[in-house]
Structures are given as structure tokens and as C-alpha cells.
Amino acid sequence: MNLYAVRAIYKFEMARTGRTLMQSIISPVISTSLYFVVFGAAIGGRIQQIDGISYGAFIVPGLIMLSLLTQSIANASFGIYFPRFTGTIYELLSAPISYLEIVVSYVGAAATKSIILGLIILATAGLFVPLQVAHPAWMLLFLLLTAVTFSLLGFIIGIWADGFEKLQLVPLLIVTPLTFLGGSFYSIDMLPPFWQKVTLFNPVVYLISGFRWSFYGIADVSVAVSLAMTVVFMAVSLAIVAWIFKTGYRLKT
């Protein structure tokens, strides 16, 4: 593996975070803090505990996941789309660097930025509600797997998009609604039986459930199932990325 090339692209993408600090870090943290103020303090005080956990603390994993998913997609999609937009993708594809190294560089940088953001939001949440992390190693594992998986999805979107407006299409119309309906603000056990079954078709349910289990030891679905589904999502994303490079789909257009 050409580690010099990987490191160069990785450092370039990480440096972009410093140039867009307001958009990449500060804005998501402020937005999430507003959720804590509105749902955790104002509304949470009027809601009973869920599985013995205060409502403000209960929504912390879901809010971290909400930011993690959207920012992973945004970071990776813009990272690979911008070279296509400016035409520098040709230099990248003709350079002595493999497709694997390109993916590792862009996806690795996007995942790193998202994980840093997730940890900052976790620290910020501690200012609003008392927190406990029952399984910190599992928490970091779910954080890593989810960030990588959705960075891969963002990479795919960046290749598919033919305009800046399409970069926001999937996050706004698909990912964000699925996250809100995936148990970010409630346990799916609170839903009627029919909707509980329907909700299980939402892939984000498994991510949030497994991540919440790492905090409080409670989950809407089996932890093993959550982990397995996360790995499946990652494998599917990797397969699509491999197909893109094999066929050259929209790499030069």
C-alpha cells in the first residue's frame, strides 16, 4: 500500500476541517445542544423515565448517532465530489495510487472527523445530563463501525451526485427521517405492536439500539443482531464501492 499517498490525501481532508470549522464541528454541536435543551430539559422533565433512565440521558445515544450519520455522509460525499467538480479527479485516478488507497484515504478521513464530532457531542451532553457508559469498548466499536459504514455511503453519494444539491438529497430525505423514526427519541417498545414490526425494517434502528446498549445496557433489539446488521451494511457499501471502481461508474463525469 502506498502509505505516502494515503497520508497525503488523509491529511488534506483533515485540514479541510480546520478551514470549515464552523460547518464541520461548531454548527452540529450547537444544533445538538439545542436538542438537549428542548427535549432533555424542557420536555424531558415532563416525561417519565424510560427503562429506569431519565429521558434526557436516554436520548443522548440517538442524538450522537444523528450527528454521526449525517456528518459521515457529508464529509465523505463532499470530499470525493469536489475533485470531480473541479476536474482534479483525473490526476487522482492517473496517480500511482490504487482504488483501495483512495477509498481508505477519503473514508478514513471522513470517519475520523465524524468520530471526533461524536466524542465532542458526548462530552457536551455531560454538561446537560448525568451520563454513564456501561460498555465503553463496545461504544467505541459501534461508533467506529457506524462512522466507517456511513462514510462509505457518503463516498457512494459523492460519486453518484451530479450537482451540489444532490449531495444533500439522501441525508435530508432518507437518512434524517430514518434516524428520527429509528428510536432516537423513544424506545420502539413504546409503539403499538404493528409499528414495532414495521420499525424493524428501518436499518438505523439497529445502529441506535446497539449504541444505546453500550451506554445503559438496554436495547430494543439483540446486541448481536445490531452488530451483525452494522457489519452487513458495511459489507454492502464496500461491494457497491468495489463495483463503482470496477465499472468506472461516474468517476470521470
Which residue stretches match the model-derived regions?
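Hydrophobic transmembrane alpha-helices and immediately adjacent juxtamembrane helices
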Residues: 1-136, 141-253
